[in-house]
Amino acid sequence: RGDELAERALDNRMREITLKAKRGTIFDRNGRELAISVSTDSVYAVPAQIEKSKKEREVAQKLAEVLNMDEKEIYDRITRQVSFIWIKRQVDLETSQKLRELDLEGIGLLEESRRFYPKGTLASHVLGISGIDNTGLDGLDLYYDQLIGGTDGKIVIEHDAVGREIPEATHRYIPPVDGSSVVLTIDETIQYILERELDKAVEQRQPKAACGIVMDPKTGEILALASRPNFDPNRYNDYPAGNRRNFAVHDAYEPGSTMKIVTAAAAMEEDVVKASDRFHCPGSIKVANRRISCAGGTSHGSMDFTEVVEHSCNVG
């Protein structure tokens, strides 16, 4: 019985702090960084220390000013009966400096890692997003989460009744294991060109959505992939959730005109037709008991075979 009580007492004195692993970097095919991890500070509180100082209201007020948070919300957090609680995660450098200068009793900063996408909106639908806890939520950051997420570590500290660390007491440090990096088939330059041209098309045509894919026909590698509307994964909460939908892979499409190039290539390879052969399009053609029309029912007139493919002519 005595051993059991001693073990319980020790458990009550132990505080465990999770150390988040750094996510692996996502590179394009040429080694250019598309998604990286950067260090940032997060604000935490040890309520027992604040209670001992009798300055709960003062601490809440000063934190609210620096963190731009509701004072009551902070007060409720720092007066909870817990040994450790987050106040605000991943604050900027200026905020960290202000908090260090305030040196508030029971308030501390813990270095964490957050995801950063240095190219902004570029390849956002490919890369996806990561949440506040540094876990993948969408795109490749979600698909490869186990690979690039790493393994979190932790610090276990023994503290006294008011939450202060006990010198030379029981401590345990398990370091985090950072995630592996990933190299994509995506080419940043080709991705930029695709997105630039896609934006032009969207501006001209005003569609509800648009997407584009560039593939190496010899290997099947995807060199670029983009979807519109777009978003910045660094601040994805500022955009409608629908902007994150990747129309290039999430939606099903009838093959339609995309198969014409296959038929055309086969015909040219078998010498059934040459690029210079000419065709006349009156706007429609009767096949068996059906009449097939070109888009919009308009006539393309006289064209060579290259123009037939260019205009996606159903008659030609």
Question: Which residues does each predicted region cover?
Answer:
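Periplasmic/cell-envelope proteins involved in peptidoglycan metabolism and beta-lactam response
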Residues: R1-Y236
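Active-site loop and adjoining helix of the penicillin-binding protein/serine DD-peptidase-beta-lactamase fold
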Residues: P175-K218, P233-G316
